[in-house]
Amino acid sequence: MNQSYFYLKMKEHKLKVPYTGKERRVRILLPKDYEKDTDRSYPVVYFHDGQNVFNSKESFIGHSWKIIPAIKRNPDISRMIVVAIDNDGMGRMNEYAAWKFQESPIPEQQFGGKGVEYAEFVMEVVKPFIKHKTGWCSCSTCKISKCK
């Protein structure tokens, strides 16, 4: 196994969600030697349901998606910055659905309708934060990469 593909540095942050006023955990997993390799550009991959991404103890079903082992087992995958955005627990379906469900499976409880707000949170809060913390740039020259 190619040891250079091991991901060792994870940073945890709390970002305020504008439409709820609550803080949300966002984790950034950086490739090994990220801070030493300043000339290299890295793509950024965003995962929703962030509780499920890294740790089985945090996953709602007791098993994580095992992103780190998957990357380690596949050395041909380019090194990348992995961003995991936690969901809102009981409000998960509201955030991931742009429209309200016509009929709720639970009487007197509405589902959906916050998808636009969640997308705005990702685009206007999370992505700029990731850019600031990692040096990632979305300009036409850099595309999905770290600016030089």
Short names for language-model regions:
Residues 1-148:
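Non-catalytic cap/lid and distal C-terminal segments of serine-dependent acyl enzymes
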